[in-house]
Amino acid sequence: MDTKKYKNITRGVSDTYVNVHPIQRGGVLTAEARKALLEFGDGYSVCDYCFEARVDLVENPPVHDLVQDVAEFLNMDDVRFTAGCRHAKWAAMHMVCEPGDTVVVDALAHYTSYLAAEANKLNIVEVPHNGYPTFEVDIEGYARKFEEVEQKTGKLLSMAVLTHVDYRYGNVADAEKVGNICKEYGVPFLLNTAYSSGIMPVDGKKLHVYFLCGSGHKSWAASAPIGILATTYEWTSKVFNKSTLRGDWSGRGFTKKEIALFGCSPVFGAPVATLMASFPAVVERVKHWDEEVEKARYFVGELEKIEGFHQMGVKPKQHTLMNIESLPLHEIAEKDKRRGYFLYHELKKRKIVGLHPGMSKNFKINTYGLKWEQVKYVASAFKDIARENGIKVED
């Protein structure tokens, strides 16, 4: 066994590069979080003063205060930190639904929404989207699916899941409308905010959300893995239900431990410390979401000056994550010895990273948090690559 390769690992990308990775922009650490990462990087480092047997109750560092402040920030009543947004979805389904129940999801849902349902032995029914080129989810379809499920099974489904911002096209779904439909039918509503809360304003109660799931490492400037599960007072005791099991021989019990969180949320060190350190900046940055959307729209406008380039998804952009169709580049890549890696290497030569290697027919990109000059630089780089390869570009 050669273990030398594990030492001194690096990403191979310096701070001088512009990172446009679609799932990393909202998770870029603040300076305060980088400091906290070093301070709390050792294992269970936030548990030095744990007296209540749960990380969410730790007072020093102020994790318990953070729980309350995050709940207030999201306009929800109670919060727990989880091992990613996927764990939050699994936990809510596990505590609310029964095996064999049906949940409705949008057809753009992240794969982990499906796996969370499957792990809980639930059935899935999808609300469709309208296909190419906008891929817009049929929000009114939630009501139709509710009625179809009730007619087929004789009972209402046990949960409705909506992806607030999908990971493929960056479409922003009308969560408030789905929330109203769920309220009318009496169906518990889970909103996946992995790409929204933490970078844009999200008000859980305004949206009639019962369970709000977020991603600290995707959108709250935290190191991975950490998720957020927020709920209302009506559901707190059910979702965060405590253990009642006792050993038949020892009599041991763990009555403070919450079942769906495996007793204590597995975010004990760097994840919760970096989330905490970045939180003041997160609270501030959502106030500037309009400017982030403005940058995204500018970027789309510049790239669509390239012949054959089109933004897929709903227009105009409401979010910074976007999917660009780029068929002329794909045709060039087919003849280039680098094949699909052509675009990746051309951008890296210009110190731009984050596009998935091998993609040229279309690509996902995210401008969130970039300075205006960086947005303009990346747009210019694409136009330069196009011109160098004989693709027409509008002046």
Language-model regions, residue ranges each:
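PLP-dependent enzyme catalytic core of the Aspartate aminotransferase-like
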Residues: 1, 147-148, 152-155, 284, ...
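PLP-dependent aminotransferase-like
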Residues: 98-156
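Conserved active-site segment immediately N-terminal to the catalytic lysine
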Residues: 203-217
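Active-site C-terminal subdomain of aminotransferase-like
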Residues: 216-318
